[in-house]
Every structure is written in C-alpha cells, then in structure tokens.
Amino acid sequence: MKKTKLQAHRGVSCEYPENTMPAFRASVIQGYDVIELDPAVTRDGKIVVLHDSLINRTARLSDGSPVHDKICISDITYEEALKYDFGLYLSQKFGNTKIPLLSDVLKLAAENNIRIKIDNKIQSFTAGSLEKLFSLLDGSTAEITCSSIEFAKKVIDRFPKMHVHYDGEVNEEALKQLSEFVPKSSLTVWLPFKCKTTEWVKVPFCNDEL
C-alpha cells in the first residue's frame, strides 16, 4: 500500500519562522515525516540553514528593524550571523531566534526519528563546502534533492544507500539513466501539478504522458 508522507517545507514555515529551530521542532510536534531545508555556508565555513543567499528577507536587527545593507551569508562569519534575529520578521513572539547550524537540525531529526530532505541548492556549493556538508551527513538518514542526473550520481557514489529526490527534467531517457544507479526503493521523482502555487516551477508539469 502506498503511504503519503507529509513534508514540512523549511519546517512548519506557515506558522513559524522558516528554516529555524522553532519551525523544525514544530515539524516534530505536528507529526510530519520529513523536514525540507536549505543549507548555506558562512564565510568561515559553517554549514547553517538559510534559503536565500542574502540574509535580508528573514533577518532583523535586535530591535526588530530591517537590515538595510545587503548582506550575503557567505560574506559573514557564523558569529556575525548570530547577531541577527531570524524570528522577528514573522512575529514579536519569535524574538531571539538565531540562525541554526545544520548539525543542530540533524541532531533534532535523529532524536525524533524524522527525516531531513536537503534542497538542491547545494549543487552550487564549492567542492570544499560540499565535502563539509557530506561529512555532516555521514551516518545520518538525510535525503538529498538533485535537479541533475550528474549530481544524483555524485550523491550515490558517496552515499550508496541514500534516498535521492530528483526534481529535474523528466523524460524516458532521464528515468532510464537514474534507474541504472539509484535503486527504485531509494528514488523519488518529483512531478509538479500545474496550479497557481506552482507557476514558478521551471521543470515540465504532469501531463498524460508523465
């Protein structure tokens, strides 16, 4: 029997600050099966969790005011990132919410038997940053999203038993190539349905052939 899995996108981001520990803890409490998140790298090489390359959309100063200067997470150290509040953009009740380390989220997941799904943005990481990320994932039950077959191969070469989520272009040839190195039980192929909330999607939508 097929089982529906509930995924918390950036944690429970409709009620809590996205990609923060409160949102991830809520995922556990509310019974989600998977936490989807977005790793990022600070200037000093720490793997944190943040969707945008700039901190400005979700970061606030301690008094709640916006950060006016454009600041890229890769241009500041982890200690510098901790000076900002990542909860106040949503509500005062989430004040003093700091940017989380990926290692802290992996620990939460391990303690609560919930899976972590890594976004495909890691495909743009440098070789050094990707290796740091892979080292963190050693021994975890994390899953990785890949938008290219080449990157999926790289993931499986490193983690032969890892579950791969493929959200790249889907056609018969792509599925054939994936099946050559990813076991059927370890592969999820994402096919978006066309609706208002998926207008931004750049891969082909589901149709009579897919």
Please name every model-derived segment.
Residues 1-210:
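Phosphate-group recognition and catalysis centered on beta-loop-alpha active-site segments
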